[in-house]
């Protein structure tokens, strides 16, 4: 079974406050006598389900076209942390990259999937992130708008992950996904030298 864990991208999809919202217009329409329908879109690449690039948090770091595809395909584990608030420590996860796959997907329950931008969401502690990266974490995905807190200006989790060659997915839709192991496929679009890239993220059930 393939499970779509991407947020539907449409006008009105909540954007990070201050970001350019997603918008679409029709450049040509068959109804107006044109031979084809052609649309044009505008918006921040952080609207909807996306992969952050290291360039997002530091000048000179790799852009969206340099994201390593292998980080976004492979074994992943969905962990439910919706009962938590504030900072989550490693012992509360019950997850080990060496035993459970190198990609961790957190269901916080604070998601834009319902049409509202959340005020807050739980995040991993810096010690937790350091420990996970040290044990081989390749990717952290969240259903929340960020792996850091809404108020953070220094974005320590972003910096620690990118410094450890681990990557980031944000705004996943994990509402109907049971916890446990999956195969993740979430390839970033090849936008050149941007701070993020949209993805169509899916999970494939693990057989046996």
For the regions a language model picked out, list residue spans one by one.
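Active-/binding-site microenvironments in catalytic and ligand-binding cores
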Residues: 1-208
